[in-house]
């Protein structure tokens, strides 16, 4: 069993389902409303745990009922919460999600996630006895992402930086990350002067650009490779990217080569969109391996 440390956001998702996505100034009727645990960090932690890794979640929640529910959900999914801390007088992070026409739109309120400082994250990393892979995203302070990538680089700990939500990154942070996994929109923010192919060629076997139902694209050095996704009828795409990143982390930590790891991650992500909720459809190890066989 590999040890994976996820440093990132934990939130409660407030999910509205509608037949139509509202335009600016428009009011539409929804068909359902649910609250489900989410946050990119928590989603990736749960997905990695279901795929068989021992997962340590490093993050913060508010001192509210959402925070309690988030912690209970992590524990119920086998995620270690030794390095999770409630923040007094602060609300838990929330994500406000509209599901319509098989896709989603999301507004994130950081809440306690904004209190994850570099010192807090690095202290947790130093205490975990052995880390095979670190996963980090951008729903936490920018300086924390920068310092964690720098620490991992200097200590030879592989780290996947999932640069979502999109924002520009310092060049040294890009250099310090072992792997970068933006989607097409995020890649355009990271590399505004480059085409997709130019960016991939600049970072072979480091930059992996996810393209939704098309799959994931990367440079193998001498050629550009597209690993196709597995075709499914999506119910809820909210957790697909998080499942992809978690599965990619697990596969790499287990020693799979890049192409095999990407195929594993694509299959896991495809399965994840077949049920409601960011975490609801996240598959087990057996489910992914059955699809691969």
Swiss-Prot record:
Reactions listed under catalytic activity: D-ribose + ATP = D-ribose 5-phosphate + ADP + H(+)
Gene name in the database record: rbsK
Sample GO molecular function, one term: ATP binding
CDD domains, per database record: ribokinase
Protein name (Swiss-Prot/TrEMBL): Ribokinase
GO cellular component terms, A-Z: cytosol
Residues the entry annotates as binding ATP: 183, 210-215, 241-242, 266
Biological process per Gene Ontology, one example term: D-ribose catabolic process
Cofactor or coenzyme needed: Mg(2+)
Keyword terms, alphabetized: ATP-binding, Carbohydrate metabolism, Cytoplasm, Kinase, Magnesium, Metal-binding, Nucleotide-binding, Potassium, Transferase
Subunit structure: Homodimer.
Binding positions (K(+)): 236, 238, 272, 275, 277
Organism annotation: Bacillus subtilis (strain 168)
UniProt-annotated location(s): Cytoplasm
Family affiliation: Belongs to the carbohydrate kinase PfkB family. Ribokinase subfamily.
InterPro entries noted in UniProt: Carboh/pur_kinase_PfkB_CS, PfkB_dom, Ribo/fructo_kinase, Ribokinase, Ribokinase-like
Pfam families in the record: PfkB
């Amino acid at each position: 069993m590999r040890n994976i440390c996820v440093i990132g956001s934990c939130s409660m998702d407030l999910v509205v389902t509608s037949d139509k996505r509202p335009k600016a100034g428009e009011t539409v009727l929804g068909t359902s409303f649910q609250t489900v645990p989410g946050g990119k960090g928590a989603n990736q932690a749960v997905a990695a745990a279901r795929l068989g890794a021992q997962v340590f979640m490093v993050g913060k929640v508010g001192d509210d009922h959402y925070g309690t529910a988030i912690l209970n959900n992590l524990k119920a999914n086998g995620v270690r919460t030794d390095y999770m801390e409630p923040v007094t007088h602060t609300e838990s992070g929330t994500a406000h999600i509209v599901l319509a026409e098989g896709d989603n739109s999301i507004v994130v309120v950081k809440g306690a996630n904004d209190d994850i400082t570099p010192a807090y994250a690095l202290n947790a990393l130093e205490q975990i006895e052995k880390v095979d892979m670190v996963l980090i995203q951008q729903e936490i302070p920018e300086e924390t992402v920068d310092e964690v990538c720098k620490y991992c680089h200097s200590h030879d700990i592989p780290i996947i930086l999932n640069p979502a939500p999109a924002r520009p990154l310092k060049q040294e942070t890009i250099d310090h990350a072992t792997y970068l996994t933006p989607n097409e929109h995020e890649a355009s923010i990271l590399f505004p002067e480059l085409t997709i192919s130019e960016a991939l060629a600049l970072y072979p076997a480091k930059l992996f650009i996810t393209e939704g139902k098309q799959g994931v694209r990367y440079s193998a050095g001498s050629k550009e490779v597209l690993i196709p996704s597995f075709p499914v009828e999506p119910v809820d795409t909210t957790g697909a990217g998080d499942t992809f990143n978690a599965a990619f982390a697990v596969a790499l930590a287990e020693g799979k080569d890049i192409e095999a790891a990407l195929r594993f991650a694509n299959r896991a992500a495809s399965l994840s969109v077949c049920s409601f909720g960011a975490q609801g459809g996240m598959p087990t190890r057996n489910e992914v391996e059955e699809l691969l066989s």
